[in-house]
Amino acid sequence: FENPDQAVDTLQAAGISIPKVQISAGLRLPQVSKADIARIKLFDDEVYLHQVVAKTAYGMERYPDLGDAFASFKEAEKPEWRVHFHVPIFLAELDGFTTTRPAVEQFLARQAKNSVTDHLEVETYTWDVLPEEFRRDDVVTNIVKEMRWAQQQLGNGSTP
C-alpha cells in the first residue's frame, strides 16, 4: 500500500542512495468476497509463500501466506488485499483481479523523468506456478514482453 513517490522521497531525504529497484507487480483485490477467495485459490501454490496485506477499517493486517489470510477472512469487513504473487508487469488484470501495476507505472514515470537508480531489475519469478490459463506463451516470450513494456514506460530508450 506504499506510494512509490513517497518511499523514494523518504529515502532521498534521509540521504539513502537507491542502488537497485526491483520492478514487480502483485495481485490486488479491492473488496475481497467469498467468490474472490475461491478464484484466488488457483494462485495458492506449494512452492512460494504469498504474503498478504489486508487493509481493513481497523488498519493493516499481515499474513505470512494465502492460507493464513483465507483462515482469517471476514467478508463483512470488505478488506482490500495485496498479495505477494509476482504477476507479469504488462498485465493490468488477471482472472478479474487487478494488479499493482499502477504503482509500477508511477515509479517508472518518475524514473523516466528524474533517474532514481541506475539499476532496474524486472522480477517475475512465478512463471511456472501461474495458473495454467496464464501460461499460454513460453517464459522467454513473456520476459521479452515484460522488458518491452518496461522500456515503453520509460519512454527514453533506457533498458531495465
Protein language model features and the residues they cover:
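Flexible, acidic glycine-rich loops studded with aromatic residues
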Residues: 61-158
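Acidic/histidine-rich catalytic cores of soluble enzymes
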Residues: 1-78, 82, 87
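Secondary-structure transition/capping motifs at alpha-helix termini
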Residues: 14-16, 157-160
